């Protein structure tokens, strides 16, 4: 199945090449989940336990709400307009002041109607050459399968070093898809620093489990 999110750095096109390379394992962990394309594309029977993690609390809240409160989430969209004014209203809201469901609705709306699914500084965009990215009449249909797929998935919100430490065991497989070198700030300020590449390398050099990392091929890496 497909991910329900358009998200910067998503692996929609590379998933078919990555998944066959995943070794046998018991526990599957996506450390930088983003749109979680590998999770959604792979056969869930490959793993006895599945965990997705992301440092972005808005994103994690969206996953948790779609998993646990889909009906309430969908209900909100009955009163929402697809318009620039509505986009700007959502954009100006403080996520911390909202309920989890409101926060998830806000983030999903901004992702769907924002230019290039930007996390940092989203701007309103309408495609003139394709169908609307957010069809209010089909949200329930589109998200029902996602709701079922997430039913057995643990959803975490930790720093990558804490995730690697918590779940590292010989039978764990980590899929690691950090921000690409040179794009560290695309996902927000203070989320990932250039020094994190070296820290990540040092941690991965000493784990018990196995991993695949997606990263751009540049001399610095």
Residue ranges of model-derived segments:
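Alpha-helix N-cap and loop-to-helix initiation/capping positions
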Residues: 191-195
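SAM-dependent nucleic-acid methyltransferase catalytic core
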Residues: 1-14, 21-22, 67-189, 199-202, ...
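Short, polar loop motifs at secondary-structure junctions
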Residues: 33-37, 142-143, 215-219
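SAM cofactor-binding core of SAM-dependent methyltransferases
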Residues: 20-94
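Conserved beta-strand signature within the Rossmann-like core of class I S-adenosyl-L-methionine
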Residues: 209-214
């Amino acid at each position: 199945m497909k991910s329900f999110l358009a998200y910067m750095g998503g692996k929609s096109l590379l998933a078919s090449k990555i998944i066959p390379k995943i070794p046998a394992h018991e526990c599957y962990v996506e450390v930088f989940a983003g749109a979680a394309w590998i999770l959604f594309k792979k056969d869930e029977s490959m793993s006895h336990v599945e965990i997705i993690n992301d440092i972005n609390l808005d994103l994690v809240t969206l996953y948790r709400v779609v998993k646990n409160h889909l009906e309430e989430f969908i209900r909100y969209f009955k009163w929402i307009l697809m318009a620039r004014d509505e986009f700007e209203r959502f954009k100006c809201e403080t996520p911390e002041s909202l309920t989890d469901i409101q926060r998830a609705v806000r983030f999903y709306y901004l992702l769907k109607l924002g230019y290039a699914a930007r996390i940092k500084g989203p701007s309103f965009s309408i495609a003139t050459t394709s169908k609307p990215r957010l069809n209010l009449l089909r949200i329930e249909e589109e998200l029902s399968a996602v709701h079922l797929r997430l039913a057995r998935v643990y959803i975490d919100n930790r720093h990558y070093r804490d995730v690697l430490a918590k779940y590292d065991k010989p039978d764990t497989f980590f899929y690691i898809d950090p921000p690409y070198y040179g794009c560290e700030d695309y996902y927000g300020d203070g989320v990932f620093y250039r020094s994190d590449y070296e820290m990540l390398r040092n941690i991965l050099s000493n784990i018990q489990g196995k991993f695949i990392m997606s990263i751009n091929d540049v001399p610095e890496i």
